[in-house]
Amino acid sequence: MYNLLSDLSIIEVSSFVASPTAGLYCAQMGAEVIRVDHTAGGLDYNRYLLTREGRSLSWENLNRAKKSVALDLQSGEGRELCVELAATTGQLITNLPEQSFLAHAALQARRADMISLRIMGWHDGRQAMDFTVNAASGYPLMCGPEDWDAQTAPPVNQVLPAWDFITGAYCAFAMLAALHHRGRTGEGNEVRVPLGDVAIGTLANSGAMAEMLYRGADRERLGNAIWGAFGRDFRSRDGVRFMVAALTPKQWRGLVTAFGLQQGIAALEAELGVRFADGDTPRFQHRAALFALFQQAADGFDYAALAARMAAEGCTFERYRTAYEAANDPALVADNPLFGPAPANPSGFDYPATRSFANLPGRDAGDPAPAPFLGEHTEDVLAEKLGLSSGAIGRLVDAGTVALSDQHTTRSP
């Protein structure tokens, strides 16, 4: 963890992916992020996959470096404590609905310069999740083999909840923008970030929306080919699949040389009356002929030999790996400074943990911090932020309004 945000405290009341991601990124830059959950855990506390000890690996990784407070959020007193924590701290990240007890108006009534950041489904208040937003975005119907029939082929969903992670990152940025504004003007802000707007807005920002409207039709499916440029997966003689991309003149020249295709490319150019060195357009328009030529050349090489040739020519390429292979690849994990030693994870399972994605040369990134046990910091936070005595906290524990650490609670997967 860096300490760039060490003077910032944020209350997080959230679940699933986008909202915890926003808090995680702030925490990895040094912010004190206090996640408040119901005493039995939030909706994501038992998110699959669970270890034999009943601990969620998803929850454990999305909540690293945070503090945990457990309140009875179904009771009036528990909700009041949560509101008081948010107002006292001044910053809130949540995905609870605006009509909930954490409505911005209620918080602003207690603190005029309150900043609340709320992740929503759709801009009109309808519920949504990454998977349903993705369905509406158009992307699943761009994916799939190019020979699929456009009228009958199924959509292809992506495994990665990309809209959740993009939304979480955008929310961390929006929170810091609101803080910067408050620092200059003294004004708080209500910030709403609909997941659906992130998806359709990304479609627009990428130029894809303008493209569809200009065409008056949908983009064709391309299989694993790169849209608008030269790139696709190929297979070596020994059966290794790898991806190549050539978007610059240097990348294109290097790829042609590495594959030994100078003469073949020259012959194809003469046949078609084009120059592939002129840019993306001729390479993309004649991709089928180029793909056949490159695959024929790949059939003559084992992957190790071809990879050495591509590396020598400065090509952009990578071998396909399974996720398990990626997790065990030294270049990606063990020898990568992004990862640090396993902290004391609540699950008891030791595995590499990430530092901040942003690397600040000259600054100590520190070792990754563990996720908390549920309620691990309840007592400390209530005492520090709200000034409650140990006796008052004890009475709240006895009443079931708050809960302390579940470290020694028996859980079943």
Task: Give each language-model segment a name.
Residues M1-R184, A304, A308, F373, ...:
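N-terminal helix-loop segment corresponding to the beta1-alpha1 unit
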Residues M1-S9, R235-R237, V274, A308, ...:
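Terminal low-complexity tails and localization/encapsulation signals of metabolic enzymes
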Residues A40, G121-D124, L195-I200, D238-V240, ...:
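Glycine-rich beta-alpha junction loops
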Residues P140, G168-G188, N205-M212, V256-L268:
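Oxidoreductase and adenylate-handling cofactor-binding alpha/beta cores
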Residues T152-P161, G183-A199, R221-N224:
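Conserved Rossmann-fold dehydrogenase catalytic segment
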Residues V159-L176, L195-N205, L247, Q251:
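Mid-domain beta-loop-alpha active-site segment that forms a flexible
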Residues L213-G231:
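Active-site Gly/Thr loop motif
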Residues F230-E313, F317:
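Aromatic-enriched alpha-helical interface/lid elements that frame and gate functional surfaces
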